[in-house]
């Protein structure tokens, strides 16, 4: 497309021209400059797929970085410490993790045992129990088994609530674990005796105290109450302090007990008391009859 030629010669002085002609001439010069920029190839106007217009830089004097093989940094790129922090976020999203009901299913338990067998040492059957405990404390699978135990315990809270309910009412609660279920999982078999069973096949035994039965010394020792806490014990030397204040001039009990006297009777008694006091002190006025 050839540039438009002006109807007015360029050599004509703009002072002698009319205002409308000057405006037309300026517009034509502006259009001519835009066409020159297009032919140079510095900018190219395009329309993208979502219907917006934009300017695309194709070639020209301004693209020195691209000609030298350098890449311009895009806006919003994470670098340095922020990039390291973003890399630590990689992993399984909480939205993609299976729920506890699926996680504790038999299929998940089998995969967990396979993972345990892969992480065992080669001479696993020769070691003693103490060395096995030290091995599992040092191994990285110890944290995984702890998380598995916590999830497994959350699924078995009904027996725990029932045992707590009965123990608060003075009933002794004892849980029996099926130890044959956890022979290949030493972490699950190392549950302390004071905790409730986390196995699905646990038996709950409740024993009620019988006063007619013969009590032994061992059972009496287990039923003894705990010593009181030091912050709950009352000190012997502490005495009740008398509160500081203004002492009352009257007995409030005597005022409160005068409920059988009416107001007229009370005023009559007070009037008689005033008259009696006036006669004892003597009258200032003399009545002449």
From Swiss-Prot:
Q: Which GO terms describe its molecular function?
A: mRNA binding
Where do the record's region annotations for Disordered lie?
213-238
Asked whether the keyword Ribosomal protein is assigned, the reply is no
- Provide the primary localization: nucleus
**Chain location of the short sequence motif UAP56-binding motif per the record:** 11-29
Gene Ontology process terms (BP): mRNA export from nucleus
Give me the Gene Ontology terms describing cellular component: nuclear speck; nucleoplasm
The domain of life for this entry's organism is Eukaryota
Task: Write out the annotated subcellular location.
Answer: Nucleus, Nucleoplasm; Nucleus speckle
| Entry keywords, A to Z | mRNA transport, Nucleus, RNA-binding, Transport
> What does the sequence similarity comment in the record state about its family?
Belongs to the UIF family.
Q: What does this protein do?
A: Required for mRNA export from the nucleus to the cytoplasm. Acts as an adapter that uses the ddx39b/uap56-nfx1 pathway to ensure efficient mRNA export and delivering to the nuclear pore.
State what protein this is by name.
Answer: UAP56-interacting factor
Species in which this protein is naturally found:
Xenopus tropicalis (Western clawed frog)
